Amino acid sequence: MTDIKMIALGGVREYGKNFYLVEINDSMFILDAGLKYPENEQLGVDLVIPNLDYVIENKGKVQGIFLSHGHADAIGALPYLLAEVSAPVFGSELTIELAKLFVKSNNSTKKFNNFHVVDSDTEIEFKDGLVSFFRTTHSIPESMGIVIGTDKGNIVYTGDFKFDQAAREGYQTDLLRLAEIGKEGVLALLSDSVNATSNDQIASESEVGEEMDSVISDADGRVIVAAVASNLVRIQQVFDSATAHGRRVVLTGTDAENIVRTALRLEKLMITDERLLIKPKDMSKFEDHELIILEAGRMGEPINSLQKMAAGRHRYVQIKEGDLVYIVTTPSTAKEAMVARVENLIYKAGGSVKLITQNLRVSGHANGRDLQLLMNLLKPQYLFPVQGEYRDLAAHAKLAEEVGIFPENIHILKRGDIMVLNDEGFLHEGGVPASDVMIDGNAIGDVGNIVLRDRKVLSEDGIFIVAITVSKKEKRIISKAKVNTRGFVYVKKSHDILRESAELVNTTVGNYLKKDTFDWGELKGNVRDDLSKFLFEQTKRRPAILPVVMEVR
């Protein structure tokens, strides 16, 4: 009898961080190894990856890591996974080249080279499953769905996808192949849910291209385009419009340079004239109406860069009168307030702003109708909605019921849930560790909720430092309390509070020194408690308080 388990270490009840495990007997297949970028309250965190403990404990079972596409939410955790687990990595040509950029940039994995290029005709036979692939449509070329064939039926993972009948070559979904997979029999479908709550018509990429061309054609001065660097379909549209209107394209940002150069080398991006791309230092050689500045980076980075441009702090570009800023990325809900602030700054600097979402519904993910079409093609026995917040997964589940999938065969997972197939279907049998692992610089997992809470306090209420010198032996204060603050109050207007705080500390320490017993921790705790109470009464704020008590022997 074949034993089958399904586990989501990421990508459920959240956006990004796609990481799914399919276990068949003693074999483990990893579907995507993605990261996500931090939320607003995760201060100082660079990125977030899944908890890999379970995979590391079972690394001898791993048959391979199979990548659906080249975005960070599918490949970004690879360096951290490969530092612990040695396994072959499979993906399309572009996906593998972009994965190499991530892997080679990490000192722990820069020598790793067990990469394998596959395409929609590839079949790889393992002891416990046959892995194959099918073409999908997304905002990056050569995205693919993944099929694991078992004697119980196919297990299908879509990755990020949508249907676009007007998609250009390299972005087309293979509908015939999907129908064939459905005829073979699909045991379980793990399907993209990001856009499941919407039935709005998604603009085709040809419509998006026409809209972009119109915007650039109407612009009299420089056009500054803000895009996600790995959204290659959007970057190709920028190149096409630039060529059509006699403009040169300036790439700013290391990510944009690396990704675009890689895609050009592989001919996944096409330009008709190598002179189209110019260096930032050469901008002064051209008139404003001859330039498009492409500010492309990771998710959220283009908006941060626009803020610097508008404030005059960007390395290469300062927004000026006549500039048009064209935002062709869809900001996350968490970034909407920031986008509004940046728009204000741009207008103050003399520029103007257009968002691609003003006139078009743009997405790289299937809407409700597309999801139902996919389910009708594949006819899965079981559905696991993945890739989305809970509301998206629940909407996907409802869509599945409408096309005839039994409610008891639809499973909305929590991260770490172990789903085991038996005679009654997939049943929940416990879980594995699946908490977020936060990366801060080179520190992996050292940033927890306590650290984030402290950072939040520091960012909102600042820090209050008080230093005092005592003689434990003589039971007296040698040097009275001195106070310093950062981010708490404006010192020039708060002399009274600081003076009274110092006097309070002198009193607290003086009273403590009269006691027969002496404990450094207790003394600092008393100072912290008394100060905290006083400062809250005076300011209604609770800064982080750092008492420094020094001893003279």
From Swiss-Prot:
Localization in the cell: Cytoplasm
Disruption phenotype: Essential, it cannot be disrupted. Depletion experiments show is involved in decay of Class I mRNAs (they decay rapidly in exponential phase, are difficult to detect in stationary phase). Involved in an early stage of degradation of Class II mRNAs (more abundant in stationary than exponential phase, show biphasic decay kinetics).
Keyword annotations from UniProtKB, A to Z: Cytoplasm, Endonuclease, Exonuclease, Hydrolase, Metal-binding, mRNA processing, Nuclease, RNA-binding, rRNA processing, Zinc
Cofactor(s) listed in the protein's UniProt record: Zn(2+)
Single biological process term from Gene Ontology: rRNA processing
Coiled coil: none
Cellular component terms per the entry's GO annotation: cytoplasm
Enzyme class: hydrolase
CDD domains, A to Z: RNaseJ_MBL-fold
Cofactor detail note: Binds 1 Zn(2+) ion per subunit. It is not clear if Zn(2+) or Mg(2+) is physiologically important.
Enzyme Commission number: 3.1.-.-
Binding site residues for Zn(2+): H69, H71, H138, D160
InterPro entries named in the record: Metallo-B-lactamas (IPR001279), RibonucZ/Hydroxyglut_hydro (IPR036866), RMMBL (IPR011108), RNase_J (IPR004613), RNase_J_2 (IPR042173), RNase_J_b_CASP (IPR055132), RNase_J_bac (IPR030854), RNase_J_C (IPR041636)
NCBIfam families in UniProt: MG423 (TIGR00649)
Task of the protein: An RNase that has 5'-3' exonuclease and possibly endonuclease activity. Involved in maturation of rRNA and in some organisms also mRNA maturation and/or decay. Has an overlapping but not completely redundant role with RNase J1 in the decay of mRNA.
Protein's UniProt name: Ribonuclease J 2
Organism field: Streptococcus pyogenes serotype M3 (strain ATCC BAA-595 / MGAS315)
